[in-house]
Amino acid sequence: ALPIFYPLPALLVSCGSTEEEYNIITVAWAGTICTNPAMCYISVRPERHSYPILKRNMEFVINLTTKSMAFATDWCGVRSGKDYNKFEEMKLTPGKAKIVSAPIIEESPLCIECRVKEIISLGSHDMFIADVVNVKADDKYLNAETGKFELSEANPLVYVHGGYFELGPKIGKFGWSVEKNRSQTKEKS
C-alpha cells in the first residue's frame, strides 16, 4: 500500500557520534507529534545503513532541505553510507550541534536536534520518537519582529509520489476562515 497523506517533508537526517560514523539519510516519513514537550518522529527501515547508527546513539538531527539542496536530498536517499561519505560527496558541511553528538548540516536553514525517547517497530519501518532538545535556525529566515522562522522564505522541499516540489504561496493563516473580515485578513496574511 502506498501512503495517502501528501505532501511529505523531504528531510536530511544526520546521525553518528564521530566523524568516521557520520551519515545522512533522506527521510520523508517524519513530523511533529507533540508541542509541549516538543517531540517529533522519523520512520526508518531497519535494513538501512543509518538504522544501527540511530539505534546505537539514540540521537539525530532533522535538517530542513531547500530547493538548492534538492540534488543532495535525492542523492542521499538513493546512495548508502556503507559505500559513500555523503557529506564529502555532496559537499555538505557537518557542523557541531549544541546538545547532541550527531552533526548538523550547515547548509540547512533549520536544524532540529533530537534525542530518541522510544523506538516502535511498526512493520516495514521503525518509528523513532524523539524529544526536540535544540533548534538552530539561520538568522536570515527569522522574522525581525516576531523572531519566528519564516518557512516560506526558506523554499523548503516536499515529496509527493516520487517527486520533489517546492511549496507555493501562502493562501491563508490558521483561523482566518472565522475572522469577521476574511477577505482583508487573507490578503494581509
Model feature map: region roles:
Residues 1-189:
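Basic, polyanion-binding surface patches
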